[in-house]
Amino acid sequence: MRPSGTAGAALLALLAALCPASRALEEKKVCQGTSNKLTQLGTFEDHFLSLQRMFNNCEVVLGNLEITYVQRNYDLSFLKTIQEVAGYVLIALNTVERIPLENLQIIRGNMYYENSYALAVLSNYDANKTGLKELPMRNLQEILHGAVRFSNNPALCNVESIQWRDIVSSEFLSNMSMDFQNHLGSCQKCDPSCPNGSCWGAGEENCQKLTKIICAQQCSGRCRGKSPSDCCHNQCAAGCTGPRESDCLVCRKFRDEATCKDTCPPLMLYNPTTYQMDVNPEGKYSFGATCVKKCPRNYVVTDHGSCVRACGADSYEMEEDGVRKCKKCEGPCRKVCNGIGIGEFKDTLSINATNIKHFKNCTSISGDLHILPVAFRGDSFTHTPPLDPQELDILKTVKEITGFLLIQAWPENRTDLHAFENLEIIRGRTKQHGQFSLAVVSLNITSLGLRSLKEISDGDVIISGNKNLCYANTINWKKLFGTSSQKTKIISNRGENSCKATGQVCHALCSPEGCWGPEPRDCVSCQNVSRGRECVDKCNVLEGEPREFVENSECIQCHPECLPQVMNITCTGRGPDNCIQCAHYIDGPHCVKTCPAGVMGENNTLVWKYADAGHVCHLCHPNCTYGCTGPGLEGCARNGPKIPSIATGMVGALLLLLVVALGIGLFMRRRHIVRKRTLRRLLQERELVEPLTPSGEAPNQALLRILKETEFKKIKVLGSGAFGTVYKGLWIPEGEKVKIPVAIKELREATSPKANKEILDEAYVMASVDNPHVCRLLGICLTSTVQLITQLMPFGCLLDYVREHKDNIGSQYLLNWCVQIAKGMNYLEDRRLVHRDLAARNVLVKTPQHVKITDFGLAKLLGAEEKEYHAEGGKVPIKWMALESILHRIYTHQSDVWSYGVTVWELMTFGSKPYDGIPASEISSILEKGERLPQPPICTIDVYMIMVKCWMIDADSRPKFRELIIEFSKMARDPQRYLVIQGDERMHLPSPTDSNFYRALMDEEDMDDVVDADEYLIPQQGFFSSPSTSRTPLLSSLSATSNNSTVACIDRNGLQSCPIKEDSFLQRYSSDPTGALTEDSIDDTFLPVPEYINQSVPKRPAGSVQNPVYHNQPLNPAPSRDPHYQDPHSTAVGNPEYLNTVQPTCVNSTFDSPAHWAQKGSHQISLDNPDYQQDFFPKEAKPNGIFKGSTAENAEYLRVAPQSSEFIGA
């Protein structure tokens, strides 16, 4: 039988209606997104591969879409699949001609770029003004939040024709920033069919699709045409295919299967029959912008119906019916802390002034608690102050001790153990002397006061030698014990007769089971009834406030909705349904404060009730939409409040949780698949030896140059010490006619294996870094005595340099140095390297305009999963260290920020000593009290506030090095505004440049072929005519990547040249080496491509401070600091800060090598080093009490000593 035409049409309509739903239910591939902004990840190739891995086949970006540093001819076709971005879209610093975001429909703008923009397209061009030409985002129809910015895109076509008011919300139009500078005549015009000439590119397919400004007045949001019947549902975003909420292209708020909704279905509904809230079988949890029936794994459920990663501070996590839920805590939430002798208290004898703060809010102690006499006396050996008796109140939250409680000292003015009044159970899993779980010995208390103690699970009790203690013999201890074998030992306390004579007996309301003190609240149990913890004579059943009922000899308060009765009972039990009479209204069997109004009921209907004259709640008429004041339609309220929508902030937070969850899930799944395939392949090849455990950490591809001893020449001894000797010398690469001034560090013949290991570790760190502002290792010679070869630095360390030239240093130099040091430290942070010893003495001066960070003797490389380094001992620079490093030996990149702040202070005070006159042993205490280094006289408050931020106690509150670069770079552009130096504009520093300088420095005559090490390792094109014949040459990629631009330019002499690195000898004497070249610097004829990450190239007016450019100035004939080079034990700095020495804190070095600092500044861990103290206290003592070794009064570097021991046995 053939179906009729009507039935066939109905079937087709049904199928058409189901198609959008099926499409909406499809699972789209999501990706995490990035938050790098303008940071480049390695080389251009590495950066592009990272971009491709992140967004390949991605349809929904949960974070931000950042397309940066993409070079010409790279294929970006993988971006075509992206349809939705939750954060912002950033397209910047690209030279590729086309970025195909053809299917991008919506940008939600949950996160902004520069606090304003959801779409930013910036500086997409190269030196030839060519670059991004096509941006075909033809399906982009809505930006929910945020404005749009276009700037410096000289080759971009057609975008200026877009009607942004159709895409961007009207509230953000005022923040739009449109700077279109397209002067190219090669752009194709929009297709004539495009509305109002608006298009994203040539061709009819690139015409802008209008879904807002063309809508009829009846439409409240988007539309698909000009007719009133073409309006989209108000829950739709970016357009629609029909009028229903299931026809949306994208949901504006939440997606519940195929339907867009304002909120997810609630978990609970009001039941008008039972007058209770019942579980909604259709209820769902909100997870990001999606409604889900079940929260993803590792998420917990809140009472509000949301999937969250962790419970709030006032709730705890528990499992109920197979679901992990957050439940409100009754009182303080449970917090488990380690006891004495465990974890962070492993070597601690007693609770004291320094560790009691760690027990704040603890409810359970995992281990034991000791309170010994040393706690209240203090310990001068460990610099522990006496414990303030008021701080014992911190222990009032403790309810459980899994080990034992030992108290041998207590404040004289306290009559009981008040700090343990809430202690409920002592489990006795560990015991003092293997016997006692509770020991109270030799105290001045009159009562125990352990009024909450209900159980001592194991172990005996000893209460002895308390001359004023009463009440202890009244306790029925057997009732508290968990086993029959437990015993008590209560001796040598105050006699029972003496206690009775002074009235120190249990209260009359206490039962014969005894008491913990004289008050009614101290009773073990009550004679009559109890109210809370206190025994009372009777309950407030017939009179008194609040009214109560009796349950198990306990007074229980009636519900607040029960009306108190006169000489009659008010309630018969707990809850609002056991009241004799209601105080306000009656809703079924329950007493309520107000009748239900707008409560969600069955079938998603709202329940409204009104109260009659008898205060009984009745249902409103079904047609009353906004409540009522009486029965029938005439009682309906005309206007009512609208249901509040979910806050935008909650949506953003849930989306962020979704990003994190999906990102982790995708990462774990991908890693599992790769590992499984690898194991399968190896098993098939029958070559599997052991399971593979790839770490995922990037390989260290640094190059280590091995030199022959014949390739370098030692000229002069710089100094010697316990580890070896440092020489000035020349490196003459084999087969090349160049001479490179170097420093050579040679170990002694009898050097220990430990010293060899330390110098090789230092070489590993130096070889792993390559930055203009970080010292580099030139090579290593593996002779019988290991030799390190590093670059020779002409001007020594920055500390001595600022001291010697303090009358000639202007604000420009000081701020430039701050920028360069921050750049070097930011590079080390990117390489996961913690320096641990940043100071002005460890910064070397290559030229007055160029400084480098050195001394990696204490530096540590963090692993892929490490965020901090825990030191085990050794020498440390106390006055430069962060507080957490001093107290806990924790070193992070943020502890380096603290040291950076001290280094800046040294520069701004022209080499003053930090905390001068204060012993190093007192530094931690004055820092904890809030004292910091004073404001230098030349610094404005702007500069000083940056230093103060570096010295915040909370490490996360300190600025990042990348932020410090931005701040000091801004100041370096206007130096006299931030530093006030008299005669600043006339100050300049000598800067010799020719080979005469090296000739004088090296005492050599034949220095015509001298070449700086940086120029040799990364030479300019055509610099050397003959190739190197060394057997260990640098890879060609080093020189190939030294310049990112291939565009030719003409220098001032008319010779062909290329853009130069900021530490190049061609730019050595620029007035501001920290900044980029400007267009004015080469007569506006050429703008070089930035060589470094985030190098800005804006054109700005010249500052008022001008630094001279030096050319061939004569060398100073007799440098004043030359004797320091000859004498490593010079006493140039008076009143030395370091122990057992008169050596200076910094000797003028001439090369960027940690080896030289180890010799001159003594930063290696050796016995003859004044700057680093191995142990502040000696480990042994002679029988006469005199310590072996030297003592310290003002050590800059010290090590935490073990605590003293004091213990009195029971």
From Swiss-Prot:
The Approximate repeat boundaries are 75-300, 390-600
Recount the known activity regulation.
Answer: Endocytosis and inhibition of the activated EGFR by phosphatases like PTPRJ and PTPRK constitute immediate regulatory mechanisms. Upon EGF-binding phosphorylates EPS15 that regulates EGFR endocytosis and activity. Moreover, inducible feedback inhibitors including LRIG1, SOCS4, SOCS5 and ERRFI1 constitute alternative regulatory mechanisms for the EGFR signaling.
- Give lipid-anchored residues (S-palmitoyl cysteine): 1049, 1146
Q: Which residues carry this modification: N6-(2-hydroxyisobutyryl)lysine?
A: 745
| Binding residue positions for ATP | 718-726, 745, 790-791, 855
Which residue windows are transmembrane per the record?
646-668
As stated in the Swiss-Prot or TrEMBL entry, residues carrying the post-translational modification Omega-N-methylarginine are 1199
- Which parts of the sequence carry Phosphoserine? 229, 695, 991, 995, 1026, 1039, 1042, 1064, 1070-1071, 1081, 1166
Family annotation (CDD domains)? FU, PTKc_EGFR, TM_ErbB1
Which reaction is the catalytic activity of this chain?
L-tyrosyl-[protein] + ATP = O-phospho-L-tyrosyl-[protein] + ADP + H(+)
Residue spans, topological domain Extracellular: 25-645
Q: Which residues carry this modification: Phosphothreonine?
A: 678, 693, 1041
Phosphotyrosine occurs at: 869, 998, 1016, 1069, 1092, 1110, 1172, 1197
Disulphide connectivity of cysteines: 31-58, 157-187, 190-199, 194-207, 215-223, 219-231, 232-240, 236-248, 251-260, 264-291, 295-307, 311-326, 329-333, 337-362, 470-499, 506-515, 510-523, 526-535, 539-555, 558-571, 562-579, 582-591, 595-617, 620-628, 624-636
Bias kind Polar residues: ranges: 1104-1115, 1128-1137
Q: Which GO terms describe its cellular component?
A: basal plasma membrane; cytoplasm; endoplasmic reticulum membrane; endosome; endosome membrane; Golgi membrane; nuclear membrane; nucleus
Q: What is its EC number?
A: 2.7.10.1
Q: Which keywords label this protein?
A: ATP-binding, Cell membrane, Disulfide bond, Endoplasmic reticulum, Endosome, Glycoprotein, Golgi apparatus, Hydroxylation, Isopeptide bond, Kinase, Lipoprotein, Membrane, Methylation, Nucleotide-binding, Nucleus, Palmitate, Phosphoprotein, Receptor, Repeat, Signal, Transferase, Transmembrane, Transmembrane helix, Tyrosine-protein kinase, Ubl conjugation
Tissues in which the UniProt entry reports expression: Hypothalamus.
Q: Where is this cross-link: Glycyl lysine isopeptide (Lys-Gly) (interchain with G-Cter in ubiquitin)?
A: 716, 737, 754, 757, 867, 929, 960, 970
Regarding protein family, the annotation reads: Belongs to the protein kinase superfamily. Tyr protein kinase family. EGF receptor subfamily.
Which named protein is this?
Answer: Epidermal growth factor receptor
Which source organism does the UniProt entry give?
A: Macaca mulatta (Rhesus macaque)
Instruction: Give the taxonomic lineage as stored in the record.
Output: Eukaryota, Metazoa, Chordata, Craniata, Vertebrata
Q: Which gene encodes it?
A: EGFR
